[in-house]
């Protein structure tokens, strides 16, 4: 049997959106949904949904649509959500602490399994029943807990050093809030969340509209 084509990263990023919408549909008591109805909920075309799902096999029936519960189970299986994933959080400042306390993780198969910081004032504090450990303990705990996912919320100047330590300990996927690009070996995946960069991409549209309004003003 021929191996399925590797799906583009953008497709993988959309799958959690499909899963979230399907969960809402289940809560609403909806049993079947068309690709058009599902697409309307997340601003994706029906054709795009069908194409995305085609990377992983055949789903639904033409003219009938998708069984909501079954499709959700299939997508969760694709995303590896049929098991629990332990996660390490490094950097327990205001942001890191908020991440550690986020209840949504527990509802979606993500378990915070380790909290780490280098600041002596943070080490030993307890967050939701879990003690913040020294970053020096990260290697041991990550290996003992079998942690493969990590979230880092540290300053840019220390982000690469932290990343190197995590990768050496066995972490293979990192969500970074540090405003810098990280260097990682093949087989390690990094996602970035940089609020400033995101806001700057939005100010482009605001500035464009303001400049357009000035240009079209009768006084200009």
Curated annotation (Swiss-Prot):
Coiled coil: none
Residues noted as binding NAD(+) in the record, renumbered to the chain: 91-96
Annotated compartments: Cytoplasm
Keyword annotations of the record: Cytoplasm, DNA-binding, NAD, Repressor, Transcription, Transcription regulation
Gene3D superfamilies cross-referenced by the UniProt entry: NAD(P)-binding Rossmann-like Domain, Winged helix-like DNA-binding domain superfamily/Winged helix DNA-binding domain
Disulfide bonds: none
GO molecular function: DNA binding; DNA-binding transcription factor activity
DNA-binding region, residue range(s): 17-56
SUPFAM superfamilies: NAD(P)-binding Rossmann-fold domains, Winged helix' DNA-binding domain
SMART domains registered for this protein in UniProt: CoA_binding (SM00881)
InterPro entries in the cross-refs: CoA-bd (IPR003781), NAD(P)-bd_dom_sf (IPR036291), Rex_DNA-bd_C_dom (IPR009718), Tscrpt_rep_Rex (IPR022876), WH-like_DNA-bd_sf (IPR036388), WH_DNA-bd_sf (IPR036390)
GO biological process: negative regulation of DNA-templated transcription; response to redox state
Broad class of where this protein is predominantly found: cytoplasm
Gene Ontology terms: cellular component: cytoplasm
Record bears the keyword Nucleus: no
Cited function: Modulates transcription in response to changes in cellular NADH/NAD(+) redox state.
Subunit description: Homodimer.
NCBIfam families: PRK05472.1-3, PRK05472.2-1, PRK05472.2-2, PRK05472.2-3, PRK05472.2-4, PRK05472.2-5
Family: Belongs to the transcriptional regulatory Rex family.
The protein's name in its UniProt record: Redox-sensing transcriptional repressor Rex
Organism of origin: Roseiflexus sp. (strain RS-1)
């Amino acid at each position: 049997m021929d191996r399925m084509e590797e799906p583009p990263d953008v497709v993988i990023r959309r799958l959690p959106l499909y899963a979230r919408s399907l969960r809402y549909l289940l809560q609403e008591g909806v049993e079947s949904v068309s690709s058009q109805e599902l697409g309307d909920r997340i601003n994706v075309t029906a054709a795009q949904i069908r194409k995305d799902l085609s990377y992983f096999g055949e789903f639904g029936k033409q003219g009938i649509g998708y069984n909501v519960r079954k499709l959700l189970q299939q997508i969760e299986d694709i995303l590896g959500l049929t098991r629990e994933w332990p996660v390490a959080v490094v950097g327990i400042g205001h942001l890191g602490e908020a991440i550690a306390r986020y209840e949504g993780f527990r509802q979606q198969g993500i378990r915070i399994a380790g909290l780490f910081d280098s600041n002596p004032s943070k080490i030993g504090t307890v967050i939701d029943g879990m003690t913040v450990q020294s970053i020096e303990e990260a290697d041991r705990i990550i290996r003992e807990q079998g942690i493969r996912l990590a979230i880092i919320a540290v300053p840019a100047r220390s982000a690469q050093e932290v990343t190197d330590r995590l990768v050496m300990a066995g972490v293979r996927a990192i969500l970074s809030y540090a405003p810098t690009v990280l260097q990682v070996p093949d087989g390690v995946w990094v996602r970035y969340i940089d609020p400033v960069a995101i806001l700057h991409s939005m100010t482009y549209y605001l500035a464009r509209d303001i400049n357009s309004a000035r240009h079209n003003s009768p006084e200009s």
